[in-house]
């Protein structure tokens, strides 16, 4: 209780400061365990909380903390300070919390300090109480820690008028039995914690029955000598009967005999104490004390924690009998290695029993019919194994509402019998056991709160007893692969299912669980596929207060490309997840593509191109069957000329005369095409038997369909032979917009190839004819000419 109270004061002060101040790191400075030998000089003037504990500081000067005008909490415990002048804090007017415990202080010099709420001078080397008259002005003081080896009643007078919430008094190792027994009587405090010297037989006569004290804690009690029989300590406890205000008594770190331990219990039994707690006990010797007097007690709760005992030289049933027949409402025995507990000999008033962290087995309270008033039973961390036996144990506990059997080795085997629970049970904690899916066939019918986390559950069977009253279910840290739904749990409002194997949660979960007000399902290996999309959509319709940990704890685990992605950021297109829509889209796309291709074929005259390709292919196939020498002999012309009929005047009067006068053999369609052959075949033959193909380009050319065909086959021959056999003569300029779309090859050729432009000036024509003759000049064989 002392540590809790101490912590609460610190926590409230720090919380108050954090509310009032910004949370910037410069306000909170922690230099503990840094090996410091003096107070750091680089502290910010805004420092509010300074922790320099567990260092080697031996002195504290005004200059060390002069600049820290906003300092409220200073923790300088566990250092080597021997002398302190409290005036060093005269410039720290906001200082409220000062911890100087666990130093080597032997003397202090006082100075008026009115704002301190917490002052700890305990565990130091003072000979007398370090209380001076200036302490009397600390009207806000709530905690005072002191240490001394010499106690006098007069030392307390300066602060007797102060109402201090908690006083901690540490008595030095030289404190003895000759000290003033009334030295504590002038303390005005609600809570008093006295720490006696360690490892020293208790021979003190101090009167701890301070009239204002409601909470008393005594630490370091050693009385193991048989001749002593713990008489000194028992005398101190006996005086507590004169303090009607005392309601809480705590004993820490006790080393005594079994007889003395039971005597302590017996003595406290007849005081005004309501709550009695004993912890860290070491017991030895025999137990002869058998006749425990339970009458006339005010005690409501007894707690015994962490007991170590030598080898028992007496039947343990003596102890169990004393414990089981106690006429109190709340009884706790934990960390004692207790192996059994007897059933009370008559109807017991126990309402709350806590036997956690012991060695109890399934036989505890077997066939016990005297715990009819019991409401809460805690058996966690024991040696329980068979659930059916535990359930049977509860059948005679007609008032039992809460049962905790967590952290055992409990399992359920259907072959070993059915489960019969008390009908009154409302809350059941079976976490951290080895339970499997079968547990859902062995549950109390009226259960409201069920904790099954950290077991071996893989699924919740559909054929289970309907738990219509179940409101809270915790199945975290199992191996569940889906959210359970509320078909069998119609009242379920709280579900904890984090850290399982849920990958594809059911999309209709929220529809089936209309009463859900809190669900914690994060930290599962969600597979971000189409199936998860519906679940995520349903989450968007749920309040953020319902889904705990959303969105940070809900992440994709698969596929690898999505791993680590928050579910709220995961999206898949409707098309990829809807098969029907995908098929319709594909069919529609194919139809559109078919219509488009058909239209393009019609517009670009694709059938004609196909026919021409067939003719070209047939001609080329025939040509491949002719030997190379014969192909060379077949080269009969220097050039084939393709032109529009509208340009025939220029061809016959300009082009032919200038070429043929130099002996050039020219192929013209009106004089060299073979009658009877198809026009296409004549064109192909003429192109193949010509060294070059000359095209006379003009606006008339692009309007001629046959010119188009001739250009098409010449272009094919160009790429097939890998030669440079194409010559373009631009007779008249051709605007790009006037070239039909079907002449796309002409556009391409004009963009990529150099052409000869017919000059209008006569002076330039000589060079034109020279270039043209040079381009088509080749020596034909005599046989080819013939």
Swiss-Prot record:
Compartmental location? Cell membrane; Cytoplasmic vesicle, Phagosome membrane; Membrane raft; Golgi apparatus
The protein's matches in InterPro entries, at most eight in alphabetical order, are given as: Cys-rich_flank_reg_C, Leu-rich_rpt, Leu-rich_rpt_typical-subtyp, LRR_dom_sf, TIR_dom, Toll-like_receptor, Toll_tir_struct_dom_sf
TIR domain residues are 635-776
List all topological domains (Cytoplasmic). 602-786
Glycosites:
51, 137, 163, 330, 429, 578
Q: LRR repeats at which positions?
A: 54-77, 78-101, 102-125, 126-150, 151-175, 176-199, 200-223, 224-250, 251-278, 279-308, 309-337, 338-361, 362-388, 389-414, 415-437, 438-457, 458-478, 479-500, 501-524
Instruction: Report how it sits in the membrane.
Output: Single-pass type I membrane protein
Q: Where is this region: Interaction with bacterial lipopeptide?
A: 313-316
Residues covered by the LRRCT domain: 525-579
The answer to whether UniProt assigns keyword Cytoplasm to this entry is no
Q: Which cysteines are joined by disulfide bonds?
A: 110-132, 223-230, 343-368, 419-442
Leader sequence range is 1-24
User: What is the protein's quaternary organization?
Assistant: Interacts (via extracellular domain) with TLR2. TLR2 seems to exist in heterodimers with either TLR1 or TLR6 before stimulation by the ligand. The heterodimers form bigger oligomers in response to their corresponding ligands as well as further heterotypic associations with other receptors such as CD14 and/or CD36. The activation cluster TLR2:TLR1:CD14 forms in response to triacylated lipopeptides. Binds MYD88 (via TIR domain). Interacts with CNPY3.
Report the protein name in the record.
Answer: Toll-like receptor 1
- UniProt source species: Homo sapiens (Human)
